[in-house]
Amino acid sequence: MKVVLAYSGGLDTSAILVLLREQGHEVVTVTVSVGQEEDLEEVEERAYKLGASKHYTVNAVEEFAEKYISMAIKANALYEDKYPLGTALARPLIAEKVAEIARKESADAVAHGCTSKGNDQVRFDTMLKYYLGDDIKIIAPVRELRLTRAKAAEILRRNGFQPPGLHKTYSIDENLWSRSIEGGPLDDPMAEPPEDAFAWTVAPEKAPDQPLYLEIGFEKGIPVSINGEKMHLAKIVSLLNRLVGAYGYGRIDHIENRVVGLKSREVYEAPAALTLIEAHRDLEKTVYTPRELRFKRILDQEWSDLVYQGLWVEPLRATLEKAIDELNRWVTGTVRVKVYKGSLMVVGRWSPYSGYSREAIDYNHGWYPSDEEARGFITIWSLHSLAAAKARSLWG
């Protein structure tokens, strides 16, 4: 049987590759680059050493930025107000590329390294079923065999291979949008994450003593420039990860509700994601009416939940994106942010579509409603609330 394996080069997928070869299967490995800081040539070399008959490295960084990250920014995507969906966003794209190669190779099955306790199994299986239907079988050895990291390492040693990354305290997943850190001391929700868990951000107390100011330009909701310099979104994200992370901003530590019914302690680094979403939300407040703003928050939450829950194929997502895109037509302008020792504050914003009027809001000059106008407005505005309050007070 020919199996196409979504291969990260880590411990689990390396053990799966050896297991599949032990079972007599031909294995074609696929590594999809979505911005992870990994030596992809080394990953390819490892795949061949472990017995892959063919290896594909797919560069999908630009596509990840332009198709997935851009919409996450427009949707202010923060699952449970914290997690910017880095891993969740990348899985549909990786599954798509793996499915394409499975078709190209006329594979009998595709395999992945997801555990039965995680969200990724839902994301991968759902997308693979969408692209491959029932023609190509989905194999999940970690789930099927309840494969622990210790067992995976033993499989590799038994076959004469050194387990990759076994010395690491943490399980890491990273891409252009975020870096996820799990395991080790982080499994204790009361334990502060040790500094060795972080790679993209410095400790805030060790950040520079002078603040960093940045001006981020947006066009129709999408970041297009930093300090006036136009650049592609992938470059903007990469640059902000480096610049903002150096000032200690971008760390996330929270309890997360997984799709599979478990609560997990999750630690992330996402300097660019948090910066761009904060700037985008501020620009939205500058241009939207109050009703648009409230409605947009509903759209954002629904979109974020669908993506987190592995339902990229859900038709509602496309419907939500049409509304999100329509509202983002007006989110054009510049946002100025100040980053200092682990904090970020928006300190300026401008848009040609701004509803803000300096003249109207000035308390010393300009337009003022008359006393009669104000009294009339307050009377009408408060009618419902006053009537209900009085009626209910009668009944205790």
From Swiss-Prot:
GO cellular component: cytoplasm
One matching Pfam family: Arginosuc_synth
Domain of life: Archaea
Catalytic activity: L-citrulline + L-aspartate + ATP = 2-(N(omega)-L-arginino)succinate + AMP + diphosphate + H(+)
Pathway: Amino-acid biosynthesis; L-arginine biosynthesis; L-arginine from L-ornithine and carbamoyl phosphate: step 2/3
Enzyme Commission number: 6.3.4.5
Localization per Swiss-Prot or TrEMBL: Cytoplasm
Family, as annotated: Belongs to the argininosuccinate synthase family. Type 1 subfamily.
HAMAP family: Arg_succ_synth_type1 (MF_00005)
Name the record gives this protein: Argininosuccinate synthase
High-level lineage: Archaea, Thermoproteota, Thermoprotei, Desulfurococcales, Pyrodictiaceae
Gene that this polypeptide is encoded by: argG
